[in-house]
Amino acid sequence: MGQKVHPHGIRLGIVKPWSSTWFANTQDFADNLEGDFKVRKFLNKELANASVSRITIERPAKSIRVTIHTARPGIVIGKKGEDVEKLRNAVSKIAGVPAQINIAEVKKPELDAKLVADSIASQLERRVMFRRAMKRAVQSAMRLGAKGIKVEVSGRLGGAEIARSEWYREGRVPLHTLRADIDYNTAEAHTTYGVIGVKVWIFKGEILGGMAAVAQSEQQPADKPKKAPRGKGRK
């Protein structure tokens, strides 16, 4: 029976960057790794309602820099930055070094696999029909420019006695093409019948040039709005 490799894991260093970017000696590596795990666990728990997509961690010169990618930056920052300051103090206490927290906004949450999976899971918990939730997510992603999307739900769908899996796909989702930019994530819906698992694959196009092209695209600022061409006036 064929099994699927994790789409991010197989593409690390090819078209996908690491979530933690730091170097440590042998004696510090385990402590840093545990610190990253605790920081992510704490932030995901504290910001459960803030639509957090991913958390990236850097460790420059005995400090920690955490970047929170979220679709709702206002909730993370809080009134006059109070909430983000509390988070900074808590992260600094967990990691044991001075902390800096950056907030990055996710411009199109419909094209983010984590946010799509969380959205479907929350709809299932609110007793929305699973087929309707899947179709709505797929249509939103395709409308906003995704090249392809696949959604799979597994469990006691609709309260059935026997658990099963159902999936829905539109467009292309090439899992074997290493240069394909595939965003993948999972979520769980805790219903009265039990847990329903949600998996989402989103194909955003192919990346030519490897990690250099990825780094260049991340460094580029957002495109400035283009000015309308001036009219020639009366002749």
Curated annotation (Swiss-Prot):
| SUPFAM superfamilies, A to Z | Prokaryotic type KH domain (KH-domain type II) (SSF54814), Ribosomal protein S3 C-terminal domain (SSF54821)
State the PROSITE patterns in the record: KH_TYPE_2, RIBOSOMAL_S3
| Pfam families cross-referenced by the UniProt entry | KH_2, Ribosomal_S3_C
- Any idea which GO molecular function terms this record carries? mRNA binding; rRNA binding; structural constituent of ribosome
Record domain KH type-2: where = 39-107
Q: Which domain of life is it from?
A: Bacteria
Keyword entries, A-Z: Ribonucleoprotein, Ribosomal protein, RNA-binding, rRNA-binding
Q: Which GO terms describe its cellular component?
A: cytosolic small ribosomal subunit
**A Gene Ontology biological process term:** translation
UniProt xrefs under SMART domains: KH (SM00322)
InterPro entries hit by this protein: KH_dom, KH_dom-like_a/b, KH_dom_type_2, KH_sf_prok-type, Ribosomal_S3_C_sf, Ribosomal_uS3_bac-typ, Ribosomal_uS3_C, Ribosomal_uS3_CS
Write out the ranges of the annotated region (Disordered).
215-235
- CDD domains with a match to the protein in the record: KH-II_30S_S3
Role, per record: Binds the lower part of the 30S subunit head. Binds mRNA in the 70S ribosome, positioning it for translation.
Query: What quaternary arrangement does the UniProt entry report?
Result: Part of the 30S ribosomal subunit. Forms a tight complex with proteins S10 and S14.
NCBIfam families found in the cross-reference section: rpsC_bact
Q: Which family does it belong to?
A: Belongs to the universal ribosomal protein uS3 family.
Name the UniProt record assigns to this protein: Small ribosomal subunit protein uS3
Species, as recorded: Haemophilus influenzae (strain PittEE)
What does the record give as the organism's lineage?
Bacteria, Pseudomonadati, Pseudomonadota, Gammaproteobacteria, Pasteurellales
Identify the coding gene.
Answer: rpsC
